[in-house]
Amino acid sequence: MWFTYTFAMLLVAGYVSAYGSGAPQSACQDMIPRHPVGPQNTSAPYIITTSTKVVKAGTPMQVTISGKKPENTMRGILLQARQGDKIVGKFTLDDNDSFAQLLDCGEPGNAITHKRHPPEFDKQTVTFTWTPPADLNDNIRFRATIAYSGAVFWLGVESPVVKVVA
């Protein structure tokens, strides 16, 4: 029993170490982290909010991921804007952002993931800037995978609909 527990913990530690510096590109479509455990089947203790419910195409807006309680911090994230299942738009970050980095999921900067950081720099709230394509005229949702730890994560956390108008 002790051996099984130790082996399982080493596997989790290996995956956390492997992807501690952000989601791999192989997770872009299904947004499933390549951890050796499955997602939580409970309601996520996180919410995604936006600075507006309607945005003009090509105009930047803010998107925020927050824990519902102070103890609901984030170790890792994968965030995208989706028009149906299509990844759309582009995120921008400050060069000195200590938590997040851009990820290329088919287009440069169309997703955000976490950087490697010590646990004391986990975040309870993060805000990013996203710009819809200049020719988009449709509804989108922000979709995220949010990890509390390497072994505890939630898939499919979504924002309310945002209408993008041309």
Curated annotation (Swiss-Prot):
Keywords: Antibiotic, Antimicrobial, Disulfide bond, Glycoprotein, Immunity, Innate immunity, Secreted, Signal. GO terms for biological process: defense response to bacterium; defense response to protozoan; innate immune response. In larvae, expressed in fat body. InterPro entries: Ferric-chelate_Red/DefProt, Reeler_dom, Reeler_sf. Residues 1-18 form the signal peptide. Residues 19-166 form the Reelin domain. Disulfide bonds join C28-C105. It is found in: Secreted. GO terms for cellular component: extracellular region; membrane. CDD domains: Reeler. Glycans are attached at N41, N96. Induction: In larvae, by bacteria. The keyword Glycoprotein applies. May have antimicrobial activity. Belongs to the insect defense protein family. This is Putative defense protein Hdd11-like.
